[in-house]
C-alpha cells in the first residue's frame, strides 16, 4: 500500500468514527513519517492530532502548505511519539505567521500514554487497554473513545479532558487552574481539584 492510499484509508477511517468531518481533499500536501515502536503520543503547539488504535504503525500529516509539513518535528522519545513544530528564531510572530493548518493522523497497535499542551487537540479512538496515563495542559484538549481498566489523569491551565466515551473502571484525576475533566466510571474515583 503506498503512502497516499494509506493516508486516504486512515482519513476515511477517522471520518467514519466521527473524529474528522471530511476527508482532507483541500490540503495541498501530505507527508508520511517512517516511525514505529511507540506506545504513547504527545501533541504540542496547537496541532490537531487524530489517533486510531489499529494493527500497525502509521504517521501521516496533511497541510495547506508543503512548508508547514517541513516545519513539523515528529520523533520518538522514550517510547512516546512527540508531535510538534520546529521553533524559528523569529519568536511568536514568526511562529504565528507560519502556522497554517496542519493535521496529523496516527495509527498505532497499543496505547498507554497521552499528552497534550500549548493548545493542541488530541482525539483518540479505538482504545482498549489496561492502564492509561493522560496529561493535558495550557489550553489543550484530549478526547478518548474506547475502554480501559484504569486511568491516571492530570489536567491544568485551562486544559480539557473528555473521557465520557471511554469506559473506565477506576480513575485517579487531578485538575487545577481552570482545567476540566469529564469521566465515565463504573467503579472507583480518586480526585483532587484546585484553583
Regions found by a protein language model. Name each.
Residues 144-195:
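Short, surface-exposed interaction patches in beta-rich subdomains
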Residues 15, 24, 117, 136-139, ...:
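Intrinsically disordered, low-complexity segments enriched in Ser/Pro/Gly/Ala and basic residues
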Amino acid at each position: 500500500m503506498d503512502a497516499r492510499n494509506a493516508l486516504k484509508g486512515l482519513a476515511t477511517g477517522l471520518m467514519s468514527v466521527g473524529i474528522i468531518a471530511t476527508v482532507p481533499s483541500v490540503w495541498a500536501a501530505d507527508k508520511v513519517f517512517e516511525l514505529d515502536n511507540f506506545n504513547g503520543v504527545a501533541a504540542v503547539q496547537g496541532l490537531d492530532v487524530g489517533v486510531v488504535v489499529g494493527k500497525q504503525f502509521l504517521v501521516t500529516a496533511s497541510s495547506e502548505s508543503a512548508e508547514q509539513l517541513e516545519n513539523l518535528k515528529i520523533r520518538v522519545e522514550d517510547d512516546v511519539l512527540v508531535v510538534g513544530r520546529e521553533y524559528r528564531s523569529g519568536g511568536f510572530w514568526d511562529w504565528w505567521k507560519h502556522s497554517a493548518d496542519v493535521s496529523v493522523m496516527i495509527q498505532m497497535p497499543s496505547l498507554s500514554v497521552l499528552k497534550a499542551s500549548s493548545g493542541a487537540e488530541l482525539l483518540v479512538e479505538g482504545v482498549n487497554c489496561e492502564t492509561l496515563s493522560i496529561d493535558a495542559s495550557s489550553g489543550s484538549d484530549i478526547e478518548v473513545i474506547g475502554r480501559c481498566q484504569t486511568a491516571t489523569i492530570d489536567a491544568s491551565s485551562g486544559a480539557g479532558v473528555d473521557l465520557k466515551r471511554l469506559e473506565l473502571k477506576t480513575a485517579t484525576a487531578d485538575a487545577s487552574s481552570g482545567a476540566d475533566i469529564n469521566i465515565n466510571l463504573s467503579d472507583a474515583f480518586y480526585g483532587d481539584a484546585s484553583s
